[in-house]
Amino acid sequence: MKTLQFFFLFCCWKAICCNSCELTNITIAIEKEECRFCISINTTWCAGHCYTRDLVYKDPARPNIQKTCTFKELVYETVRVPGCAHHADSLYTYPVATQCHCGKCDSDSTDCTVRGLGPSYCSFGEMKE
């Protein structure tokens, strides 16, 4: 019984005190206006949860910053979209996260909305393999 209680307390401590914001492999749809279709590529991005809280009483002197799992460092990779017209620019550059942390969402470089379009959204409706 004590082992079960210890395990339960350990799980609660892990959920509250330890962030699990880490790199994860994802598949995203990339599209070029000139090519009129999308392709899927594999990349890494940040996923997980971060300890945060929403205060009941708002204090204007202390801003309430919600922490989210976001990138700390990025690199950019470029891929050639196959099957584009010869006159079209078929190069596409996309971000690859190399390090993650729990921090404030930077709306200048990230979609901080509650529910974005998602990584597999394709505005053309046609995916090529």
UniProtKB/Swiss-Prot annotation:
GO CC annotation terms, alphabetical: cytoplasm; extracellular space; follicle-stimulating hormone complex
Glycosylation site residues: 25, 42
A Pfam family the protein falls into: Cys_knot
Keyword Metal-binding: no
UniProt entry keywords in alphabetical sequence: Disulfide bond, Glycoprotein, Hormone, Secreted, Signal
The keyword Signal is assigned to this record: yes
Gene Ontology process terms (BP): follicle-stimulating hormone signaling pathway; G protein-coupled receptor signaling pathway; positive regulation of bone resorption; positive regulation of gene expression; positive regulation of steroid biosynthetic process; regulation of osteoclast differentiation; regulation of signaling receptor activity; Sertoli cell proliferation
Taxonomic superkingdom: Eukaryota
Main location group: secreted
Subcellular location: Secreted
Signal peptide (from-to): 1-20
A GO MF label: follicle-stimulating hormone activity
SMART domains reported for this sequence: GHB (SM00068)
Disulfide bonds: 21-69, 35-84, 38-122, 46-100, 50-102, 105-112
Role this protein plays: Together with the alpha chain CGA constitutes follitropin, the follicle-stimulating hormone, and provides its biological specificity to the hormone heterodimer. Binds FSHR, a G protein-coupled receptor, on target cells to activate downstream signaling pathways. Follitropin is involved in follicle development and spermatogenesis in reproductive organs.
UniProt record similarity statement: Belongs to the glycoprotein hormones subunit beta family.
Binding partners and assembly: Heterodimer. The active follitropin is a heterodimer composed of an alpha chain/CGA shared with other hormones and a unique beta chain/FSHB shown here.
Protein name: Follitropin subunit beta
Lineage of the species this protein comes from: Eukaryota, Metazoa, Chordata, Craniata, Vertebrata
